């Protein structure tokens, strides 16, 4: 007999009750005023949800099994496969934090309809963690150079730039539950998952990788519900005018945090780790963030009094350069990574100049020097080209080189009795709003200040099983591999740029 979905959903809602024998206490208190009236836009029932997700899992894992039989892992362009090592180390943490966010919202939001949506999303995020870890395992077992795929959380926690990912994804779970919802569902999932889970898989497929699209597009099929959860939560709290300034502040904060990490990181993977490029990240950002998120999603919220994020114009100014500056910083310090890099060929450089006019004037000489330093017999790494390493921002933990090193927005300010660096006005503003949130951050330089680079690499575990060859390499050539002895000969000392 056919079931009436609305009646079944209403029956499930009837199981909710308000206890009279105990005074409810907020486990995760919120400063937002949350009205009781709200709607779950999908009206999901667990029985239907499980059947739908089971079908998707069967398709995905069945394809991955077939891909192994066709030796697809070794048909992927190696340059592209290497970028999956940091990506698949960082993403499970983001998904795990997203799942914990749903638990916070279930506790904080006294509305059975929204809670039902949060429950389905919590199950989704658990599934996504498993999918991404499995994809890393798939490549670790079947890819020609698995070193680095096995490091996971250990790897990204110790990397200078990848650890900035943790700093951003912690905003999904650290703080006010409604703010976490805005950071995750309204900004992270609605603005940035399309570039990650739709555009990036297209790049993967163009480079011979069909496993990543299978997994990522399966994940993205859940994201529409997560966006709906965010929209329903946002509209609910917007219905109380007292919340508007709090929501606008959260919008301003978390859009900038998402931009400064995701656009730098994902833009680097898309443009610098592709052999067969289907487009540049700058254009993908225009399509998915500006046209789709700002032009469609944000425009619908203007009637509630919500404005586009305060720092959107600065993000637009950054986009032509941000991933190039991030790539230069990452490639300059390639030895402290757990994946291999590749030199940029003349064809690569021509592509960059064509898609980012002026690129060669600002970055071309660096890439020429990088190419000449790829051989360990040259006895130099690109970081030695610079008088010092760039300071790391106290808030976002990214290097203060944006939009470009020659026109960076670095601010070095005395705060709480110590010199602190900020990459932008936005990050300094966030620090001043909640200094206690960021004072405990010990950045990468502070951890390793005064140490020899070789000792740091050994401590981080970025060494291959032979005990001497580095996991990271500045090239993909199986010959002329760098060893820890090559690094020791450099006598390169890690120096905190803000050392007193």
Question: Model-predicted segments: where are they?
Answer:
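Inter-helical turn/loop segments and adjacent helix faces that build the functional surface
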Residues: 104-116, 138-145, 171-179, 198-218, ...
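Intrinsically disordered, low-complexity terminal tails and linkers in eukaryotic proteins, enriched
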Residues: 343-419, 423, 428, 436-500
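Acidic/His metal-coordination segments adjacent to aromatic residues that form catalytic metal sites
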Residues: 66-89, 148-187, 206, 254-276
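Extended, helix-rich structural scaffolds rather than catalytic motifs
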Residues: 1-38, 244-376
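Long, hydrophobic, well-ordered secondary-structure blocks that form the structural core
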Residues: 88-163
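Conserved alpha-helical segments that form or flank metal/cofactor-binding pockets of metalloenzymes
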Residues: 13, 17-65, 126-151, 231-234
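Alpha-helical scaffold segments that form or flank carboxylate-/histidine-based iron centers
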Residues: 6, 34, 39-44, 83-87, ...
């Amino acid at each position: 007999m056919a079931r009436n979905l609305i009646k079944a959903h209403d029956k499930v809602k009837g199981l909710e009750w308000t206890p009279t024998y105990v005074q409810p206490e907020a486990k995760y208190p919120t400063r937002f005023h949350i009205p009781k009236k709200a709607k779950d836009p999908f009206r999901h029932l667990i029985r239907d949800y499980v059947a739908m997700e089971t079908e998707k899992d069967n398709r995905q894992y069945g394809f991955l099994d077939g891909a192994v039989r066709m030796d697809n892992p070794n048909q992927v362009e190696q340059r592209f496969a290497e970028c999956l090592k940091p990506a698949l180390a960082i993403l499970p943490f983001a998904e795990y934090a997203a799942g914990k966010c749903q638990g916070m919202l279930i506790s904080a939001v006294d509305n059975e309809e929204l809670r039902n949506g949060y429950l389905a999303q919590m199950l989704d995020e658990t599934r996504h963690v498993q999918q991404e870890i499995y994809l890393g395992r798939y490549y670790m077992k079947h890819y020609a150079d698995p070193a680095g795929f096995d490091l996971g959380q250990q790897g990204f926690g110790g990397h200078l730039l990848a650890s900035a990912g943790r700093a951003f994804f912690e905003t999904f779970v650290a703080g006010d539950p409604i703010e976490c919802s805005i950071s995750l569902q309204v900004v992270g999932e609605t603005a940035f998952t399309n570039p990650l889970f739709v555009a990036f898989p297209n790049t993967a497929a163009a480079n011979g990788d069909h496993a990543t699209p299978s997994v990522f597009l399966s994940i993205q099929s859940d994201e529409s519900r997560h966006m709906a959860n965010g929209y329903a939560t946002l509209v609910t709290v917007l219905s109380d005018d007292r919340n508007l300034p709090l929501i606008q502040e959260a919008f301003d904060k978390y859009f900038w945090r998402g931009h400064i990490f995701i656009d730098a990181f994902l833009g680097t993977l898309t443009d610098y780790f592709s052999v067969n490029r289907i487009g540049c990240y700058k254009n993908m950002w225009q399509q998915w963030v500006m046209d789709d998120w700002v032009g469609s999603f944000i425009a619908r919220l203007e009637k509630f009094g919500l404005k586009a994020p305060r720092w959107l114009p600065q993000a637009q100014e950054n986009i032509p350069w941000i991933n190039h500056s991030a790539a230069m910083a990452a490639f300059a310090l390639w030895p402290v990574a757990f994946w291999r890099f590749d030199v940029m060929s003349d064809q690569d450089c021509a592509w960059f100049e064509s898609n980012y006019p002026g690129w060669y004037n600002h970055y071309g000489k660096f890439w020429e020097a990088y190419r000449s330093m790829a051989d360990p017999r040259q006895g130099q790494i690109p970081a030695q080209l610079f008088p010092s390493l760039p300071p790391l921002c106290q808030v976002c933990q990214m290097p203060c080189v944006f939009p470009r090193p020659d026109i960076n927005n670095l601010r070095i300010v005395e705060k709480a009795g110590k010199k602190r660096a900020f990459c932008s006005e936005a990050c300094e503003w966030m620090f001043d709003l909640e200094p206690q949130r960021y004072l405990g951050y010990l950045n990468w330089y502070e951890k390793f200040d005064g140490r020899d680079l070789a000792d740091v690499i050994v401590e981080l575990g970025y060494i291959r099983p032979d005990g001497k060859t580095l996991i990271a390499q500045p090239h993909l050539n199986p010959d002329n591999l760098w060893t820890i002895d090559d690094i020791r000969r450099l006598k390169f000392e890690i120096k905190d740029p803000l050392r007193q």
